[in-house]
A protein has these predicted regions:
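Short, glycine/acidic-rich hinge or "gate" loops at secondary-structure transitions
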Residues: 95-100, 113-117, 136-140
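Conserved short secondary-structure elements within globular domains
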Residues: 122-196, 331, 335
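Conserved small/polar residues in nucleotide/adenosyl-binding loops
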Residues: 340-347
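N-terminal leader/targeting and assembly helices and adjacent pre-domain segments
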Residues: 1-109, 194-339
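N-terminal "first-domain core" detector
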Residues: 104, 108-116, 124-132
Length: 350
């Protein structure tokens, strides 16, 4: 499969990181985040489709997709900080943009091409295995054991060879420690069986799972564990930045209608994040219609009509008003589409 990363997305991300408005320790670069999250979700869906199991239920799928966002956010935080560290020269002066870009392109290329491709391929495998595991749980009354199948790789590694053809019950603690997919690009597999269990194989340190692959995505819904270096060895501020971003995503999703699928809601959230960034807007405190119309959020707002018992204007309830001499139409009408409640000029009569 052809794998690429948008040059335009990378360009926008570099411009954003270089700008004074961006804070790499406390924010997540949205252009990179959305692109990487979308690719990880694509990998997950590809993995689900390769499994012969029934498609995982929506709650489990949503957990996988949301955790892909968490992984992507930590990856971006690492990447943006690795590049931001090179912004200043030895004298503490900001480098010219073109010079800085030349210095950080190797970092960017490594993260969004070489490593991202490896992460994508591994995510496909582990999503496939997660779907399989859900099916194993559904069939455990008939097929209570799991069998480790040999690698299909042309050049299989030696680390998993001792586990080939091992058969253990699905709830055996062995599967908490070792599973196909706990090495990068592992091509081993599992199958459910009613064959009798075999003895536990010998183990040594060479057989340990690689960091970030030491969990079972079929039970926790994470294609990469919390022990991945992006998270376990994150730069300062990463956890707070990721938590803040995920809280905003969860907030947006909670406000969307129930007829949308989780996948559709997350896609809309991605789009909303881009809009918020592009327009430099953020959600404020809730405001009722009256407050919004009266522009109470703006302490300098001036009303066009003010109450006056001797005023010549009256509303439908009999209240009298006069024109406010301090009102300036050009200055004090903030929106051309402003909707009036009483007293609206349309409701006043002389």
């Amino acid at each position: 499969m052809e794998f690429d990363f948008s040059e335009e997305v990378l360009r926008r991300a570099l411009l954003n990181i270089y700008s004074r408005d961006f804070h790499p320790a406390t924010e997540i670069e949205i252009n990179l985040f959305n692109e990487i999250w979308a690719k990880m979700d694509k990998a997950a869906k590809e993995g689900f489709s390769k499994s012969k199991a029934i498609t995982p239920d929506e709650d489990f799928r949503n957990a996988i997709l949301r955790n892909n966002a968490v992984f992507s956010a930590f990856k971006v935080h690492r990447m943006q900080n690795d590049m931001a560290r090179l912004l200043l020269d030895s004298n503490g002066i900001l480098k010219p943009f073109d010079k800085w870009v030349q210095e950080v392109l190797p970092i960017a290329s490594h993260q969004v091409r070489h490593w991202l491709r490896t992460e994508y391929d591994t995510a496909v495998i582990r999503a496939h295995q997660a779907a399989d595991w859900q099916q194993f749980l559904r069939e455990r009354d008939i097929l209570p054991n799991l069998k480790w199948l040999p690698s299909t790789s042309i050049h299989p590694g030696a680390d998993h060879r001792p586990f080939w053809n091992t058969i253990r019950p699905i709830d055996d603690t062995f599967w908490n420690i070792h599973r196909p997919g706990d090495r990068w690009n592992c091509k081993c597999d599992l199958t459910a069986t009613d064959e009798e269990p075999t003895p536990l194989p010998d183990e040594d340190d060479k057989n340990k799972p690689q960091p970030g692959l030491d969990n079972n995505p079929g039970t926790d819904g994470k294609l990469f564990s919390d022990n991945h270096p992006y998270q376990a060895e994150a730069h300062k501020g990463a956890q707070k930045a990721v938590d803040k971003l995920m809280a905003r995503i969860d907030e947006m999703i909670a406000e969307m209608p129930d007829y949308l699928t989780g996948e559709e809601k997350m896609a809309i959230a991605r789009n909303n994040l881009e809009m918020e960034k592009a327009l430099k807007i953020k959600k404020g405190k809730p405001m009722d219609v009256d407050k919004a119309d009266k522009q109470n959020a703006n302490p300098k707002h001036v009303e066009e009509y003010i109450l006056d018992s001797k005023g010549i204007y009256r509303d439908k309830r009999g209240n009298r008003y006069r024109k406010n001499s301090d009102y300036d139409k050009k200055r004090d009408t903030p929106y051309s589409c402003l909707l009036y409640t009483s007293p609206s000029p349309r409701d006043l009569s002389t």
